Swiss-Prot record:
Keywords: Apoptosis, Cell cycle, Mitochondrion. It is found in: Mitochondrion. The gene is G0s2. PANTHER family: G0/G1 SWITCH PROTEIN 2, G0_G1 SWITCH PROTEIN 2. It comes from Rattus norvegicus (Rat). This is G0/G1 switch protein 2.
């Protein structure tokens, strides 16, 4: 089919053949589905820059969230290490004071 103008005579010719009524319905169904495919393709082409920008924003937000979580985790680890050192220093000073009293 080179043009849309050939479709109408073809459809009329197919309708005149009574034995092929199912074939006409199938042909019309295929044409409608092809038309919807073309329309959806055009809509996707027009809207794709907007969806790409939103995906990029979502990805940047996810990266920032992960970065914040890693920073919080490292701060928590540093706090635990510092707390462990203070407890260790306290235990060490107690041990030294007990030794002085014992001798």
């Amino acid at each position: 089919m080179e043009s849309v103008q050939e479709l109408i005579p073809l459809a009329k010719e197919m309708m005149t053949q009574k034995s092929r009524g199912k074939l006409v319905k199938l042909y019309v169904l295929g044409s409608v589905l092809a038309f919807f495919g073309v329309v959806l393709g055009l809509v996707e082409t027009v809207c794709s820059p907007f969806t790409a920008a939103s995906r990029l924003r979502d990805q940047e937000a996810a990266v920032a969230e992960l970065r914040d979580a890693c920073e919080q985790q490292s701060l928590h680890k540093q706090a635990l290490i510092a707390e462990g050192k203070t407890q260790e220093a306290t235990l060490c000073s107690r041990a030294l004071s007990l030794r002085q009293h014992a001798s």
